[in-house]
Each structure stands twice: as structure tokens, then as C-alpha cells.
Amino acid sequence: MAKPACVFLPPAFLEATRAIMPADLSMDDFIAACQRPLRRSLRVNTLKISVTDFLTLVQDYDWRLEPIPWCAEGFWIERGDEELRLGSAAEHLSGLFYIQEASSMLPVSALFAGAEAPSRVLDVAAAPGSKTTQIAALMNNQGGIVANEYSASRVKVLHANISRCGVKNVALTHFDGRVFGAALPESFDAILLDAPCSGEGVVRKDPDAMSNWSPESVTAIADTQRELIDSAFHALAPGGVMVYSTCTLNAQENQQIVNGLLATYGDAVSIEPLGDLFPGAKQALTAEGFLHVFPQIYDSEGFFVARLRKHHSVPPLAKPSYKLGKFPFTPLSGKDSAEIAQAAAASGLAWDKTSRLWARDKEIWLFPAELEALVNKIRFSRIGLKLAERFTKGYRWQHEAVIALAVADGKQRFELDATLAQEWFHGRDLYPEPPPQTDECIVTYQQQPLGIAKRIGSRIKNNLPRELVRDGVLDFHQ
């Protein structure tokens, strides 16, 4: 458990929070919860491993895992050795789990509540990727997700996390989220708008989160949120579901934003109450059916979640005036696609018909078929994953493709022990005894793919991308 930090709570914030605090909750408990260290939590990445198999894998570790009630894959975690970063664990490096705050698992759980099975999803404010990867896992890498991030620097982090988790059904965009209603009207059957906010709920993680807080800043942020939710609603197809969420507590950024949408669009939209989302949800349920999570309720961050249903079309927004430019990819023929799939299978890689091959010069990419209809409607930073580069003598398979597409029973797999796996993540060449029998192999640890490598004599040449190389001590439970 992290050491307590002195959390700054502005007097005006405390006064505003006191005014909206439910009668069955106490301000003293709220302030005490804000001053306590935040419990660490993780979410098992079921694209890589089942929850049952994960629990079996780590059962001998000095980890105490407590299930998170609203996410079947989520657990609070306490470890015997807190000195080693959880992010340095072998299971994190290989994508078996994502370090994610418990409350932030709520919006995606709400999006997929009941029998909801969307095929095309928009994540309006996606970085760093916790919710995008959670969505991808619940979709089992099928369908398609447009993951948008306005901050250029955070797009790289978003891609890194998607790649580590073996996600293949995502397209990345880099826009102000207010463009989607005009650019892609009625194009998604589910939308997550985890809106930028004043961050009142995250003080346990960031003691200085409120240092720039003011009533004026809340008003300015709420203005943006109103525009974002309106745009997202236009991008939602009739019959579709949208979740609006924030990690803040005030009504101006939460209830008032949703109620404003209801007032604008009348019977085109309705609230779907979340009181039955999980056992104990009613402790945070508002009269309208939203979840308003104060940190003392579940000993978590503060959060707000609303689930909305669109019932029919609304008048469209003006079409955007931007120019897209020429799309640089072309779809591959059936013959070319079959040849590449055969070569990939020989190297231990495979995919299904929900992905299709496109080319840009010598690059071969694997696009989610569900998102092909959006090509030439909006500019993408990247779609799907880069599968290979084509050369005269064959193909050079790419790291992200190996992580997402390696088959479990491939003959080219070469299992490393803990010592060699750490060397791999440190970016060093390996000298296993005996060496692999094939010139090219997919190196694995705990049966999970770590990357692709070439055998040169008795040496395995390390091809781990430089940005993934780790320095320092790693936690491999030898």
C-alpha cells in the first residue's frame, strides 16, 4: 500500500461537495477517504488468458487479490513486496493484465450491461487505453473500435498499450472529439464518452489534482462536455447505447450534462438505470438512475456513470469542411491474401475473416473489416495492426502482429525460462541451451508470445522494439 499523502482540497470544493453529498453519506468519511492511499487494482486481459488460468498462474505469488464487484476480470491487489513496481511484473509486460483503477472499469461494464453486443464502438477520449483494451476484450477482438485521443503525445501511449494487450480490432484517430457527430453521423452502435473533466475524484492517486481547481474552471470544462456529448449522440446509431462518464463529482459536469442532452432531444434519448449493474450498485444510485460514486462508498476513486439509449434519428449536424487527402492503402486481392496467410501460418500466425489485408508500398496491414466502411470518411492515425513488410525472399513479421496473432500450438514457439525472459525484456541477445531448431522463432514465456527472433548460430537475436526495452529490476518470480 502506498504511503499517505497530504491531499489538497480547496474550501470552495468542499463547500460545493457538501451541498451535493447524499444524506446517507458523511463529509467526514469523504474527507477521510480522500486522504487514504488508493488501493491498487488490475484487470485480467482475457484476450490473452482466462481469469481462472490467471488466478492459477499467480496463486503461489505473495499477491492478495480481492474481486471487484462490477468487473468480472478486475481485482484489487496487495503484494508482499511493494518495492517492485507492479508494472515490472512478467505478467504485465506480456499483456496478461492491465493496471487499471477499479472505478474506471465501471463505464465499460455499464456499456456492455445486459445483452449488449456492439459490433462498432467509439471511444471518444481513449488514452491511455485502459477502457479501449477493456472494450476489445469484451468484444473478443471482433468487430471494430475507433479509439480517439486529442493529445498527440498520448496517442503513442494508447498505441503501446493496445499493442501490449494483443488488440487487433482498433483504429486510432487524433481529433477533437467534437468532430465525430458531423464526420461520422449514426455510425456506431455503442459509444463511450469518458469525458475530460476537473478530476475531483482522482485526488487519492494525485494529491495535487485539485491545485488548479476553481468554480470557473469547472464551468469552462462543462461547456466542452456539453459539446462533446452532443457530438457523440449524433455519431450514435438509432437503437445504440452511449455511456457518459467522468472521474469528477460535481453535478455541473455530471447530472447537468446528461440532463441537458435529455432536454435537447426529448424522446430520442432515455436513461437506462444502473441499479442492477452489480451487487451493491444501489449504494451509488441516483434518483435518475446514474451511478454517482463518492470515494468512501467502495473505497475507490470518485466516478460518475450514466447509460443512455438513442431511440431515433435527430436532425444532422453540418457536414465537416476538412479535406481527407488520398487514403494510402489498397485492399489486397484474394490471391495475395491467401499467399500471405499461408506464409504467416508457416511462421505461427493466424487470423479470422473479421480482419482483411491491405497494403501500403511494401507494408502489409491487417484491418478490422467492420471499420472498412469508415475509410474515406475520416482520417485515421492507424488502422488495425502492421502485419509485415514484404521482401523479395519473403516477409518480415512485425512485433505487434506476433503479440496479437501467435497461435498457441505453433511449432515455431520457443519457451524461455525466467532468466532468459528478463534478458529479452532488457533488450539483450539470448544464448539458450539448447538453441531453437528453427532459424525464426516466436519466443514465449509462460506460454505467452514476447516477440519474434532470428537464430544466428547459437544466439537468438533480440528484435524487441527499442521503446519496449526495460531497464532496472523486473519481477519474474523465479
From Swiss-Prot:
Cell compartments where the protein resides: Cytoplasm
Function as written in the Swiss-Prot or TrEMBL entry: Specifically methylates the cytosine at position 1407 (m5C1407) of 16S rRNA.
UniProt keyword annotations, A-Z: Cytoplasm, Methyltransferase, RNA-binding, rRNA processing, S-adenosyl-L-methionine, Transferase
Gene coding for it: rsmF
The protein's name in its UniProt record: Ribosomal RNA small subunit methyltransferase F
Catalytic-site annotation from UniProt: C247 (nucleophile)
Similarity comment: Belongs to the class I-like SAM-binding methyltransferase superfamily. RsmB/NOP family.
Pfam families attached to this UniProt entry: Methyltr_RsmB-F (PF01189), Methyltr_RsmF_N (PF17125), Methyltranf_PUA (PF13636), YebU_pre-PUA_dom (PF21150)
Substrates-to-products reaction catalysed: cytidine(1407) in 16S rRNA + S-adenosyl-L-methionine = 5-methylcytidine(1407) in 16S rRNA + S-adenosyl-L-homocysteine + H(+)
